[in-house]
Amino acid sequence: MGRTYIVEETVGQYLSNINLQGKAFVSGLLIGQCSSQKDYVILATRTPPKEEQSENLKHPKAKLDNLDEEWATEHACQVSRMLPGGLLVLGVFIITTLELANDFQNALRRLMFAVEKSINRKRLWNFTEEEVSERVTLHICASTKKIFCRTYDIHDPKSSARPADWKYQSGLSSSWLSLECTVHINIHIPLSATSVSYTLEKNTKNGLTRWAKEIENGVYLINGQVKDEDCDLLEGQKKSSRGNTQATSHSFDVRVLTQLLLNSDHRSTATVQICSGSVNLKGAVKCRAYIHSSKPKVKDAVQAVKRDILNTVADRCEMLFEDLLLNEIPEKKDSEKEFHVLPYRVFVPLPGSTVMLCDYKFDDESAEEIRDHFMEMLDHTIQIEDLEIAEETNTACMSSSMNSQASLDNTDDEQPKQPIKTTMLLKIQQNIGVIAAFTVAVLAAGISFHYFSD
């Protein structure tokens, strides 16, 4: 038996309202959450057409020649940045004027694998063996309204299609629990002199990958308590007269404890690394995750929070490097420091839902630009007054110094002078020196943790 997809009714209305306007097809993304028993779809969004495609797509004879995988995968990557923890791009859809043919299903299959590969390439985390590895393709014939729903195993490029059930349900968007936390980070990334061929972006990602292990191995307090991962998240909540568990609050406070010292099983000798500089990433970020309220497990909730922490930090660094590349900012002299504004997080309510999506705003961007970007990427209208700015401006400091000092310095006094309440500071220090990167084995039986939250 194939998987079952429980779909918010408004998604069905959205798909029905898409007008082909003489085009051969319209494609897009399906967004929601996987669970062991079934998947939940709460949002569908069409891929915005390229301007140069507007004329070509009006001719049905073009068929699938105009299904631009590169454009569709770029859209998927942009949308993936806007999803909080717990939500994923579950698959792709296509609405056509033609009856189902193998060409359409093959094209959908290729598109689905391309989208998944593109999104996964930028993640700091990997799916576990226990997680659902199937993704969905949905084909709708505009003339007959017939639906063809199939899934593929993303871990097997040669997997064949499996039929799946597509069921609409009202009120799905209100059946979600939220988890919120503020995470303070202080990441030091040495830039190896032997890896000069690596770009700054690649070096930074390598450093973030090491930091990600700390987040993965952290201890997570939910409403101040450490809970067994196999417990029900709503355990201890009041029950209704019908015996159903009712959450007294739809929001949970999460705090993170990261391991400060290693135990004796992780002995390591000191290593010396020749470095040309270093990157320091410091500050606080607001994180938010959502999980469906149907028998939620603690481990699923914690996993959603972990992934939101990793995603939001990695996405901001990537956006900063993209901005620097696009604007072609000239390098400063060796003795000068350079400050750049990192994007800060803005949450946006999904219309008719308790779930909030997010976007990122640079300091020189207006609220109108964020609204327009949201509408372009997700094809849904929002109001400017609904934007929730969760953070203060985050600032990046890039400095260059050709002296021979060690780069394991304290940068607290080198932050910008303007008042910043919630700051993510990225300091890039260029120098000719030696960094002693070492790990000390701890013989004590206990494990120390560093309090890593607000």
Swiss-Prot record:
Gene Ontology CC annotation, any one: membrane
GO biological process: protein localization
Keywords: Membrane, Transmembrane, Transmembrane helix
Tissues/organs with expression: Ubiquitously expressed.
Membrane topology: Multi-pass membrane protein
Pfam families the UniProt entry points to: ODR4-like (PF14778)
Compartment annotation: Membrane
InterPro entries: ODR-4-like
Transmembrane parts of this sequence: 82-102, 432-452
Main location: membrane
Function of the protein: May play a role in the trafficking of a subset of G-protein coupled receptors.
Membership in a protein family: Belongs to the ODR-4 family.
Entry protein name: Protein odr-4 homolog
Native species: Homo sapiens
Organismal lineage: Eukaryota, Metazoa, Chordata, Craniata, Vertebrata
Gene behind this protein: ODR4
